[in-house]
Amino acid sequence: MDKDFIISFAKLMSISGYEYCCEKEVDALVEGIFDESFKDSLGTRFFIKKCGRENAPKILVDAHLDEIGMVVTDIKENGFLTVTNIGGVDTRILQASDVIIYGKEKIFGVVGSTPPHLQSAEDTKKLKKIDELLIDTGYSKEALEKIVRIGTPVGFDDHYVELADGRIAGKSFDNKACAACAVDAIKNTPREELAGDVILMLSAREETGMLGNGASVGAYRIDPDYALIIDVNLGRTPDTPKTETVELGKGVSLTYCPVTSKKLTRMTAELADKNEIKWQISVSGRGTGTNTPDINLTREGIPCVDVGLPLKSMHTCSELLDLNDAQAASDLIRAFICSKEIAEVFAR
């Protein structure tokens, strides 16, 4: 899997509710791959690649495009900004972080941090709330107000680092790395090999799902025969529980839980084995923390398989993935959209 393609997606500014800001860039990244494209009023993008056969099954591949971020709540004296979070920002890592403020022009800022020399013993035990933090821009208030206003989105700085053994770290791999994997899979699949018409849904507002999820609206509009949802899954580290995480470098995860189709998941696992694609099991007694529950409950119910890309340090500015897992994700999506066996079972 091409790391530069993944990073090109991850660099896009698509904070929940502001997905429209990257429409032109997304169009450029998928140019020449799809037959049709359109969007809805929530900001979800749809891209269709047809198999060329009449009355073909509709296969939905969902990868949410939005990312966590912040939004300006006030402009203070001496060029400081206050913000609140959009989605589940990990406030533990915010102090001293580099950020980008997407105003009339893109400007940079740093989240302020009190030096340890000036902190009391009690201060060191406290975690500041996000609305207590200040972003330093270096501008005067007067100059800043010409560029930024209340309601301006703020995101993590878009720097990326390459680690050993094919691992990379940076912002917004949740979930734009998965979007890149889905595009890569569809791009590399000749239409005559498709088991049906494939609809890629780059859904909006997953990170703020309690406020209304773009996936449920989009799935209702498309009304697919069955669906594959790809999102990141919690990567295992020495300090995290084995039962709630998956390993990097061991391939994608397939989630068994009440809202996934057991038959579709089993057939997808068999497909992975047949194509020698690495995969691992993820189990939940509830939902998935992805778009799967929303899509599953759409209309009369849509059979879903939940595919996970292992990711460490989720919801931070340094999310970490393994490119081999990304390749496995792309390979499995390609095998899935080409599976005549799955189409025969789940086509309505």
Stretches found by the model and what they are:
Residues 1-348:
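N-terminal hydrophobic/helix-forming segments and targeting peptides
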